[in-house]
C-alpha cells in the first residue's frame, strides 16, 4: 500500500563485509599449514574482503540478520563507494591472517584473538556505515493518506511480518556445458556466511531460457 519503499542496502552491506571478514579468517585457519604461495592461501590473501556477491550470499545475510527500510540505515559516503577504504581493511585482514597462521602453527588457541580481530572490523564498519539498528519503529502513510506506526520491530520481525520467509523457494540456475547437466554444484570456501554454502543447478541453455521466460510471464523478475 506504499507509493515508495526500498530496503536498506547499507544494512546488508555492513553485514556482508563483516561476514566476509569472518569467512576469510575461517578459511585462513583451514589452510594454515599451507605455504603462502600455495594456490588457496595465495588466492585468499589476494582479496580478503571482495565487493559484490550472488543470490545465495544475499539470502544468507537476510536469513541471519533480517532487513530494514532504507531510512532506518541510510547510505553514507563510504557505503556508496568502497574504493577508498577497502584497501585499508584488506591490509588489516592480511596482517590478521599472518598472526593467526603463526598462532595455529604454534598450537595456540586462536578463538579469542580471532574474536578481537572481528570486533575491530565491526568497529571500523560502524565508522564507515553507521551502527546497525537493533529495533526501530516502522512509520508510514499509505496510498489513502492513512498514517500507520508499527513499533519496536527488529530486523527479523520486520522480515517475517512484511516480507515473508519464502526466499528458500528460489534456486540459482546456471548453464555450464563443460560440467554435467541436471546436477547441483557447490563452491567451497566462497560466499559470506560461514554456516551457509553456495549452490547452483546446472541446466541446458534451452531449459535456462525457458525458465527465464516462464518466470517473467509469472510477473517475477529474473
Q: What are the residue ranges of the model-derived segments?
A:
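Catalytic-core signature of thiol
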Residues: 2-222
Amino acid at each position: 500500500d506504499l507509493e515508495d519503499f526500498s530496503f536498506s542496502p547499507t544494512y546488508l552491506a555492513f553485514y556482508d563485509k563483516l561476514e566476509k571478514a569472518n569467512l576469510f579468517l575461517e578459511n585462513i585457519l583451514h589452510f594454515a599449514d599451507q605455504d603462502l604461495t600455495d594456490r588457496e592461501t595465495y588466492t585468499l590473501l589476494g582479496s580478503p574482503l571482495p565487493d559484490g556477491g550472488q543470490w545465495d550470499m544475499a539470502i544468507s545475510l537476510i536469513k541471519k540478520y533480517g532487513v530494514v527500510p532504507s531510512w532506518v540505515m541510510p547510505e553514507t559516503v563510504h557505503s556508496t563507494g568502497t574504493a577508498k577504504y577497502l584497501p585499508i581493511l584488506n591490509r588489516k585482514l592480511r596482517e590478521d591472517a599472518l598472526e593467526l597462521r603463526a598462532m595455529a602453527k604454534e598450537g595456540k588457541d586462536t578463538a579469542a584473538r580471532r574474536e578481537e580481530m572481528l570486533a575491530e572490523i565491526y568497529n571500523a564498519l560502524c565508522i564507515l556505515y553507521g551502527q546497525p539498528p537493533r529495533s526501530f519503529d516502522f512509520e508510514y502513510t499509505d496510498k489513502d493518506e492513512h498514517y500507520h506506526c508499527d513499533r519496536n520491530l527488529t530486523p527479523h520481525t520486520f522480515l517475517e511480518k512484511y516480507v515473508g520467509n519464502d526466499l528458500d523457494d528460489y534456486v540459482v540456475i546456471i548453464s555450464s556445458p563443460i560440467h554435467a547437466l541436471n546436477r547441483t554444484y557447490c563452491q567451497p570456501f566462497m560466499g559470506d556466511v560461514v554456516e551457509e554454502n553456495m549452490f547452483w543447478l546446472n541446466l541446458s541453455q534451452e531449459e535456462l531460457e525457458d525458465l527465464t521466460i516462464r518466470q517473467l510471464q509469472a510477473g517475477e523478475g529474473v
